[in-house]
């Protein structure tokens, strides 16, 4: 029963608050706040990179305002960790894309997860994208077009879930084609596409258009230098596009970092539908309570950092030292500037520093790192692979993080390091510009060159010899706001902006 109206027509408080609240909301989200967060990896189950961390954190950060549900492929690793999966819906075949059941689980914190089930497409060993041998799955186009089409079917209410979202949030090229499938079928569900790394575009030959169910008259939307790009199709058809940092959103509109899509992205920016939002990091990254640390510490109590440094030196076979400890927590690839680190390593060692490296990647760079450990025993140590507990202890014990990435859409390692009082030494690009305050919470250098990195290292060594300045910078880094509450609030606003772009949605039942 609605509250009674006062004589004279003004509503009583409860109804008045309801009306005033809903008058402020976009009409497209006033009645329901369902969002389908479509992603190809999620750290709860399987992770190939930073996207998996974002997918695990962002939907949870938004659930206080939206009914956010996640859609992810049913990889073998997902099914092993999911436990009992309830079949709740089904998407039909489309062109060469097979029909798939949709399973559902609910995480312990209440987050609903839809799992796209296909033994043929997803139940394999390896990562979401490559086999155990490191080669891409040959049918990735079919696999991720199936995921995208399933998202569009759910948005249209055709999957039998008894629920459909008012907005699709699509992540990177594996999900980007969903925006196209929505539009090509006459749908009006607003689509937000988040680009986590523009370099990965989902390129496939034109000959696959029919198999993917792309209308002949729309193939040009995907055209990319003689191939089709899933990501380009998403950029063209999404209502709004965002990247994972403000600076990266600007940089990709130019040829240097636009990866061949700069003119298209510049056009979207000119229309006000390209935005940058810096990622957050999970609250579990807390040096006072982190489960991976034997010795905890805070901005007011530093002893635990020294204990962690000793553990890191022991784990990497480094000698006891009072000099600075430099950490490298990264994929060992050219993009991350590992070749630059290999070039400056002799300077670091000569100045009394030590280096601990964890990660894997390009065989040539792995060999260069291994050679450094042989050349400088006790001063350079490496673990080829990844182990999260060890990585966290490195952040908690090292003095500096080396991060000379040639490009970095956002980057998470620098924020993890800052939270633990480890100062990033980073190339001024993308999200590193937005998250590292030069001389305050870390150090930036302007050009991805050996000489620029050397000059920045000299600044870091000078700071290390000034304990008061070093402590002040550590405190500033640890206190820098980097939680998902900040990023989450910006995504809430972006959801409402994106929904407002498609006013026809209000008429969809």
Curated annotation (Swiss-Prot):
Catalytic activity line of the entry: [(1->4)-alpha-D-glucosyl](n) + ADP-alpha-D-glucose = [(1->4)-alpha-D-glucosyl](n+1) + ADP + H(+)
Tree of life domain: Bacteria
SUPFAM superfamilies: UDP-Glycosyltransferase/glycogen phosphorylase
EC number: 2.4.1.21
Key word Transferase present: yes
UniProt signal peptide: none
InterPro entries on file: Glyco_trans_1, GS/SS, Starch_synth_cat_dom
Coiled coil: none
GO process annotations (BP): glycogen biosynthetic process
Annotated pathway: Glycan biosynthesis; glycogen biosynthesis
Role this protein plays: Synthesizes alpha-1,4-glucan chains using ADP-glucose.
Protein name: Glycogen synthase
Species per Swiss-Prot/TrEMBL record: Xanthomonas oryzae pv. oryzae (strain PXO99A)
Originating gene: glgA
């Amino acid at each position: 029963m609605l509250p009674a109206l006062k004589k004279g027509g003004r509503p009583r408080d409860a109804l008045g608050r309801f009306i005033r609240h809903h008058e402020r909301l976009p009409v497209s989200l006033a009645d329901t706040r369902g969002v389908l967060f479509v992603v190809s990896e999620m750290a709860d189950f399987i992770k190939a990179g930073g996207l998996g961390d974002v997918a695990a954190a962002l939907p949870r950060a938004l659930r206080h305002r939206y009914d956010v549900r996640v859609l992810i492929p049913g990889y073998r690793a997902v099914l092993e960790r999911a436990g009992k999966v309830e079949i709740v819906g089904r998407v039909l075949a489309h062109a060469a894309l097979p029909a798939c059941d949709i399973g559902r689980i609910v995480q312990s914190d209440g987050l609903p997860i839809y799992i796209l089930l296909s033994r043929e497409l997803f139940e394999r060993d390896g990562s979401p994208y490559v086999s155990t041998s490191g080669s891409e799955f040959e049918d990735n186009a079919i696999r991720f077009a199936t995921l995208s089409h399933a998202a569009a079917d759910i948005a249209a209410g055709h999957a039998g879930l008894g629920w459909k979202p008012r907005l699709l949030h699509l992540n990177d090229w594996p999900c980007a084609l969903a925006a196209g499938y929505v539009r090509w079928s006459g749908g009006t569900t607003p689509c937000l596409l988040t680009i986590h790394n523009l370099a990965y575009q989902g390129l496939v030959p034109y000959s696959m258009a029919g198999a993917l169910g792309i209308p002949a008259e729309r193939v040009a939307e995907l055209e990319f230098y003689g191939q089709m790009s899933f990501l380009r199709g998403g950029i063209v058809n999404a209502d709004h596009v965002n990247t994972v940092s403000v600076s990266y959103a600007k940089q990709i509109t130019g040829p240097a970092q636009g990866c061949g899509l700069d003119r298209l992205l510049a056009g979207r920016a000119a229309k006000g539908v390209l935005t940058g939002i810096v990622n957050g990091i999970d609250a579990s990254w807390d040096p006072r309570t982190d489960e991976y640390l034997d010795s905890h510490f805070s901005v007011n109590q530093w002893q635990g950092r020294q204990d962690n440094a000793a553990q890191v030196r022991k784990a990497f076979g480094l000698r006891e030292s009072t000099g600075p400890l430099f950490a490298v927590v990264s994929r060992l690839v050219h993009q991350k500037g590992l070749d630059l680190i290999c070039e400056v390593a002799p300077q670091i060692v000569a100045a009394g520093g030590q280096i601990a490296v964890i990660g894997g990647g390009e065989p040539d760079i792995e060999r260069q790192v291994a050679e450094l450990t042989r050349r400088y025993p006790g001063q350079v140590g490496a673990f080829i692979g990844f182990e999260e507990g060890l990585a966290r202890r490195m952040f908690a014990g090292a003095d500096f993080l080396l991060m000379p990435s040639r490009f970095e859409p956002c980057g998470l390692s620098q924020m993890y390091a800052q939270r633990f009082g480890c100062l990033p030494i980073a190339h001024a690009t993308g999200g590193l510009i937005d998250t590292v305050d030069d001389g305050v919470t870390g150090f930036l250098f302007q050009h991805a060159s050996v000489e620029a990195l050397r000059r920045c290292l000299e600044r870091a060594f000078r700071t290390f010899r000034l304990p008061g300045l070093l402590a002040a910078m550590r405190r500033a880094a640890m206190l820098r706001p980097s939680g998902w509450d900040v990023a989450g609030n910006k995504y809430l606003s972006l959801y409402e902006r994106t929904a407002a772009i498609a006013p026809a949605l209000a008429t969809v039942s």
